[in-house]
From Swiss-Prot:
InterPro entries, A to Z: Asp/Glu_race, Glu_race
Active site: C76 (proton donor/acceptor), C180 (proton donor/acceptor)
Enzyme Commission number(s): 5.1.1.3
Species whose genome carries this gene: Borreliella burgdorferi (strain ATCC 35210 / DSM 4680 / CIP 102532 / B31)
Entry's family note: Belongs to the aspartate/glutamate racemases family.
Name of this protein: Glutamate racemase
A Gene Ontology BP annotation from the UniProt entry: regulation of cell shape
Organism taxonomic ancestry: Bacteria, Pseudomonadati, Spirochaetota, Spirochaetia, Spirochaetales
């Protein structure tokens, strides 16, 4: 039976988007959120744009049979640049984009954008390099694996950070733009290692969501008076590493729903 209340779907390949979920929920209360970790296709950074478009369309069709979708937040830079302006749904789609040139505070900064290979190879990022005054891009896929898989990948993450530090020192970078939602879990580690601040775009994403759904930050509180409280929910797309994901569900107060079938 379909849930009659509109939900906001937050979508990523794994746990990267959870920090976005937490931030959005803190700003827009009262709505029900459904988080989908497409772990079957992790990491997105190694998939083609065509594959990622098919993956999104397939999963949204499944979710539409269960929920009345009010909005879709693609809490992943890779899938956002891959399917940007290619989705045609009746509900709004909010993208997480490495839109360096739109941030006024970064216009005159020497910026290092770190992201996955697929993100960096996109037209969106290539346009950013051409538009921005001083933007260098570097792949940092090893950091994604470290966030998702843990200590077994730490040595690769440290090697990656060493290479990024070399780039920062030798090109005089002033700030790092996090072009992958997984990196936000490592914000303190990245800042400590590179000795420069990072920029992350959760605020831009939540403002776009508020605008696209045509409501204020506090409209969600209205729903609390009209509907019984409903748990926010969490889905996977493959039956693996269940304990890992269930622990994150507890941390973020999400009800684990298992696999989307």
């Amino acid at each position: 039976m379909k849930n009659f209340k509109e939900v906001i779907i937050i979508f990523d390949s794994g746990i990267g988007g959870l920090s976005y979920f937490k931030y959005i929920k803190s700003r827009i209360g009262g709505c029900q959120y459904v988080y989908v970790a497409d772990n079957k296709n992790f990491p997105y950074g190694e998939k083609s744009p065509e594959y990622l478009l098919e993956a999104v369309l397939f999963l949204i069709e499944k979710l539409k049979k269960i929920y009345n979708i009010g909005a879709l937040v693609l809490a992943c830079n890779t899938i956002s640049v891959s399917v940007y302006n290619k989705l045609n749904f009746v509900f709004p789609v909010v993208y997480t984009l490495p839109d360096v040139s739109s941030v006024s505070d970064l216009v005159l900064k020497r910026v290092l954008l770190i992201a996955t290979n697929t993100t960096l190879e996109s037209k969106f990022v290539k346009d950013q390099v051409n538009i921005h005054n001083d933007l260098i891009v570097k792949a940092a896929g090893e950091l994604v694996n470290f966030v998702e898989y843990g200590e077994n990948y730490k040595k690769y993450a440290l090697r990656c950070l060493e290479a990024l530090k070399f780039e920062v020192v030798n090109t005089g970078r002033e700030i790092v733009f996090l072009g992958c939602t997984h990196y936000l879990h490592l914000k303190v580690m990245i800042e400590d290692f590179l000795k420069i601040p990072v920029y992350e775009n959760r605020e831009l994403v939540v403002k776009n969501l508020i605008r696209s759904m045509n409501f204020s930050e506090h409209k969600g509180n209205y729903y609390k008076n009209d509907f019984d409280f409903v748990d926010d929910e969490f889905y996977l797309t493959e039956n693996k590493n269940l304990t890992f994901y269930q622990n994150f569900c507890k941390k973020y107060n999400l009800r684990f729903k298992g696999m989307i079938v």
